[in-house]
């Protein structure tokens, strides 16, 4: 599908609607590498009260980006030694092994698997640090998942 729009009688903006297949990596490659990404956090002024479905909020919320409060996530990756369909990763938060975060990371990887199937072929070493205190009311999981997503897309 192809659309064009007239903006202020001066500029034309073109958009091309793509199908889901356009986003799926079909050339599976086993490589080694690393990436580092930073993502800003946010703080809610009007908080949402729960979710339904696949991460849809029950009600609207209002939040502000805190550009100085960042999560920095590094991902190093290499082909897995044992070939199987399981995700393979280690996670450190603030320099410490943090298995409590594994279920959230596992769920995230399962949700994006159809778009980045090559991730299953690699072992990931994920390390994350915040420039702000954890559990302080600042949305650290949002910035952490953003930085993780950017890192995976850089593989």
What spans do the regions from the language model cover?
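Short, positively charged and aromatic/hydrophobic N-terminal segments
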Residues: 7-8, 12-13
